Each structure stands twice: as structure tokens, then as C-alpha cells.
UniProtKB/Swiss-Prot annotation:
Heme b b562 binds at residues 83, 182. GO terms for cellular component: mitochondrial inner membrane; respiratory chain complex III. Heme b b566 binds at residues 97, 196. GO terms for biological process: mitochondrial electron transport, ubiquinol to cytochrome c. The lineage of its organism: Eukaryota, Metazoa, Chordata, Craniata, Vertebrata. It is found in: Mitochondrion inner membrane. This is Cytochrome b. Binds 2 heme b groups non-covalently. Its cofactor is heme b. Its main location: mitochondrion. GO terms for molecular function: metal ion binding; ubiquinol-cytochrome-c reductase activity. A ubiquinone binds at residue 201. It is a multi-pass membrane protein. It comes from Cynomys leucurus. SUPFAM superfamilies: a domain/subunit of cytochrome bc1 complex (Ubiquinol-cytochrome c reductase) (SSF81648), Transmembrane di-heme cytochromes (SSF81342).
Length: 379
């Protein structure tokens, strides 16, 4: 008798992806973040759907509708804070997932990596538009500042900004279209995730050693399903601790003040997960230069496959490259810290140095160190 799991047209796709998938026997907990990102996306889509049932995308009522969700809707406060803090968990998992890819050389899977970079851009765009929806002070001014950056594009800049705004300032039209995009983009993300997985399953997973593991594979289920469940439980635990004990820890108090175009907050800053890019943006005095640096700070990830000059794939056996990697991590943490500080001495200088260092480590130091290691190993 044939097994339905292996013959049914639909179930066999799931079987080949999550059950009988041959996986390397030595992948560590760093390989858990893919499944955790899938969980985060599912949580965000579900909580977002229930929030959208009660939210109104009108400048007059948006702020009140969020208040109404928190006060009057059954467990509305829970849904709202799970969605807000779920975004933070999403980005923590994203950064760790990308960091894992950089450390172990997963970027040599060219298509998978580039789809991942596109996913990162789309997730960042979605999160930015979501932050505008509660229509608090930081929502409004964040939207104004970031959309205004497009005016730095020569010739078409100003027209482009007014086209995105749907008027001459961030207003009702902007809020409505941001809500529409914020609703639809997660489904586009889900489709891109499918493509990401499609390309990944063409090659199979990388592993910590960076070596081909075809001779040593184990079935995904039960070994990695159990492992993934542990990760899921830990993620839900972390999320619920955040939601139930300090839901506003990562938020901005200014967003509890309704949007007022006549009053600018003293320090306009985005959510914590954008601070590193925000620092790079404001480290350059020139507007267009800042915008280009901002875009390139993420786009630079797609250059990693081209910058890989080492004879080894993973950094597991390359101590000098490991040092450079952790310098890069420390630099990103510095950039994140500076992004939350006011624009004054010494923060401006630290931000500029950290921004220069970020690009220097990636474009110069990592390849040079890799070449030195090749020489040391007489390759």
C-alpha cells in the first residue's frame, strides 16, 4: 500500500519540505531562526488581521480606534501589544538569521541569499508603514521625515514625495494608502518566503563546518521538528514576557500623544530596529548622500557573495575573520545606540566613525583578512 504522505499531490510537497527533507546532521541552534521567522510572520498576520477588524484608517479616528482596541475590544490590548512587540521579535530573529548567514557563508547560495535581501527590504518597508498607523506623534513625524528623504532624488524627487503623500503633506490619503500597503505586503512576504525556501531546497541547507554534507544527512522529522518546537516555545516565552510585563519597553512615549502637525517632537527617531540605518543616514551632512548610504547599508548584503575570497566557506575555522565579524556586530550595536541619541557632540562624531567603520569592515577588512588567512594556510 502506498503512503498518502508520499503520493498525495499536496501533502507530498509538505512531506518533501518538512518531514522527509534530508538535513545535515550537525546544524546548530543558529539554524532555528528560519522556522522562528515563519512563526513570527504567522503571528503578525493573525494579530494584524484581528487589529484590522477594529482599526479605522482616518486621521480623525485612527488614534481613537487604537485606544478603543486596547480598552474595549476583548483582549484587544493583548492583540495590539503582541503585534507591536511581535515586530521586535521578528527583527531580532531577522538580524540573527542574517548574522548566521554571514558567519557560516550561507550567502554562497546566491539565489536564496538575494531573495533573503529582498525579503529584508520588504519587511522593513512593512514595519515602517505599520508604525505610521497608530497616528501618534512619532508615527506622523517619522512618516514625514522618512518619506521626505525621497525628495533628495534629482529632478523627480519633489513630485515623487507628493505622489506618495497624495497631497502636500502627510495626511488622510497617506494614512489610508499606508494601511492598504501594510495589509497586503505580509502576504507578498509569505509568497517570497515560499520562493526563498524553493531555492534553499534546491541546494539543501548549509552547516556550521561549511563543508558538503551529502554523505551525512538525517530526516528533518523527528530530529529537527523537535528542535524547532523548542525554539518556538522559547520565542513565545520571550514574546509573552515582553507583552505581559513591559509592553511599552521598546516603544516611544511620544506615540501616546495624538499626531499634531504643528508640534514637532524634540527627538524624532524610528523604532529600535531601524536605528542603525538611521544613524548612517544622518551621519552624512548631504541629503542625497545620506539616502544613498541608507539604502546601500542594507543593499551591501547582496555584495557578500562577490566579496567572498576565502578558500573556506564558513568562518568556523577562521579566527581572524571571526574577529572582524564580531567587530562588525559591535559596530552595529554602536550604530543602534547612537541612533537613539540626540544630534550633538560627541554622538555625531561617534556615529560618523561607526558608519565609516561599517562600510570599511565589509568592503575592505573582511576580504583582506580572508586573503591573509589563505596565505597563512598556504592556499
Amino acid at each position: 500500500m502506498t503512503n498518502t504522505r508520499k503520493t498525495h499531490p499536496l501533502i507530498k510537497i509538505i512531506n518533501h519540505s518538512f518531514i522527509d527533507l534530508p538535513a545535515p546532521s550537525n546544524i546548530s541552534a543558529w539554524w532555528n531562526f528560519g522556522s522562528l521567522l515563519g512563526l513570527c510572520l504567522a503571528i503578525q498576520i493573525l494579530t494584524g488581521l484581528f487589529l484590522a477588524m477594529h482599526y479605522t484608517s482616518d486621521t480623525m479616528t485612527a488614534f481613537s480606534s487604537v485606544t478603543h482596541i486596547c480598552r474595549d475590544v476583548n483582549y484587544g490590548w493583548l492583540i495590539r501589544y503582541m503585534h507591536a512587540n511581535g515586530a521586535s521579535m521578528f527583527f531580532i530573529c531577522l538580524f540573527l538569521h542574517v548574522g548566521r548567514g554571514l558567519y557560516y557563508g550561507s550567502y554562497t547560495y546566491f539565489e536564496t541569499w538575494n531573495i533573503g535581501v529582498i525579503l529584508l527590504f520588504v519587511v522593513m518597508a512593512t514595519a515602517f508603514m505599520g508604525y505610521v498607523l497608530p497616528w501618534g506623534q512619532m508615527s506622523f513625524w517619522g512618516a514625514t521625515v522618512i518619506t521626505n528623504l525621497l525628495s533628495a532624488i534629482p529632478y523627480i524627487g519633489t513630485t515623487l514625495v507628493e505622489w506618495i503623500w497624495g497631497g502636500f503633506s502627510v495626511d488622510k490619503a497617506t494614512l489610508t494608502r499606508f494601511f492598504a500597503f501594510h495589509f497586503v505586503l505580509p502576504f507578498i512576504i509569505a509568497a517570497l518566503v515560499m520562493v526563498h525556501l524553493l531555492f534553499l531546497h534546491e541546494t539543501g541547507s548549509n552547516n556550521p563546518s561549511g563543508l558538503i554534507s551529502d554523505s551525512d544527512k538525517i530526516p528533518f522529522h523527528p530530529y529537527y521538528t523537535i528542535k524547532x518546537i523548542l525554539g518556538v516555545l522559547l520565542l513565545i516565552l520571550a514574546l509573552m514576557i515582553l507583552v505581559l510585563f513591559s509592553p511599552d519597553l521598546l516603544g516611544d512615549p511620544d506615540n501616546y500623544t495624538p499626531a499634531n502637525p504643528l508640534s514637532t517632537p524634540p527627538h524624532i527617531k524610528p523604532e529600535w530596529y531601524f536605528l542603525f540605518a538611521y544613524t548612517i543616514l544622518r551621519s552624512i551632512p548631504n541629503k542625497l548622500g545620506g539616502v544613498l548610504a541608507l539604502v546601500f547599508s542594507i543593499l551591501i548584503l547582496s555584495l557578500f557573495p562577490l566579496l567572498h575570497v576565502s578558500k573556506q566557506r564558513s568562518m568556523m575555522f577562521r579566527p581572524l575573520s571571526q574577529c572582524m565579524f564580531w567587530f562588525l556586530v559591535a559596530d552595529l550595536l554602536t550604530l543602534t545606540w547612537i541612533g537613539g541619541q540626540p544630534v550633538e557632540y560627541p554622538f555625531i562624531t561617534i556615529g560618523q566613525l561607526a558608519s565609516i567603520l561599517y562600510f570599511t569592515i565589509i568592503l575592505l577588512m573582511l576580504p583582506i583578512v580572508s586573503l591573509i588567512e589563505n596565505k597563512l594556510l598556504k592556499w
